[in-house]
């Protein structure tokens, strides 16, 4: 069984890591990064919600009445 012959493992692993390193470098170098990101407005927009506020309140377990 050739898998049990450990004499070629180092060469195989080294070749695999080198190939992956080169491929990732080529893939990353082709990516175009935005040169100047646009500033976004920090104003918070008011959303019109169709539900009532009383049904959307989040209750903390410690603030609930004891039963």
Swiss-Prot record:
Taking the first listed entry, what is the main subcellular location of this protein, grouped into a coarse class?
mitochondrion
Q: How does it sit in the membrane?
A: Single-pass membrane protein
Q: What's a GO biological-process term for it?
A: proton motive force-driven ATP synthesis
Provide a Gene Ontology MF annotation, just one.
proton transmembrane transporter activity
Query: What's the superkingdom here?
Result: Eukaryota
Q: Which UniProt keywords apply?
A: Acetylation, ATP synthesis, CF(0), Hydrogen ion transport, Ion transport, Membrane, Mitochondrion, Transmembrane, Transmembrane helix, Transport
Any one Gene Ontology cellular component term annotated for this protein:
proton-transporting ATP synthase complex
N6-succinyllysine modification sites are 54
Q: Which residues cross the membrane?
A: 8-24
Could you tell me which residues carry N6-acetyllysine? 54, 57
**Annotated S-S bridges:** none
Subcellular localization(s) per the UniProt record: Mitochondrion membrane
Q: What does this protein do?
A: Subunit 8, of the mitochondrial membrane ATP synthase complex (F(1)F(0) ATP synthase or Complex V) that produces ATP from ADP in the presence of a proton gradient across the membrane which is generated by electron transport complexes of the respiratory chain. ATP synthase complex consist of a soluble F(1) head domain - the catalytic core - and a membrane F(1) domain - the membrane proton channel. These two domains are linked by a central stalk rotating inside the F(1) region and a stationary peripheral stalk.
PANTHER family cross-referenced by the UniProt entry: ATP SYNTHASE PROTEIN 8 (PTHR13722:SF0)
Q: How does it assemble?
A: Component of the ATP synthase complex composed at least of ATP5F1A/subunit alpha, ATP5F1B/subunit beta, ATP5MC1/subunit c (homooctomer), MT-ATP6/subunit a, MT-ATP8/subunit 8, ATP5ME/subunit e, ATP5MF/subunit f, ATP5MG/subunit g, ATP5MK/subunit k, ATP5MJ/subunit j, ATP5F1C/subunit gamma, ATP5F1D/subunit delta, ATP5F1E/subunit epsilon, ATP5PF/subunit F6, ATP5PB/subunit b, ATP5PD/subunit d, ATP5PO/subunit OSCP.
Question: What does the similarity note say?
Answer: Belongs to the ATPase protein 8 family.
Indicate what this protein is called per its UniProt record.
Answer: ATP synthase F(0) complex subunit 8
What is this organism's lineage?
Answer: Eukaryota, Metazoa, Chordata, Craniata, Vertebrata
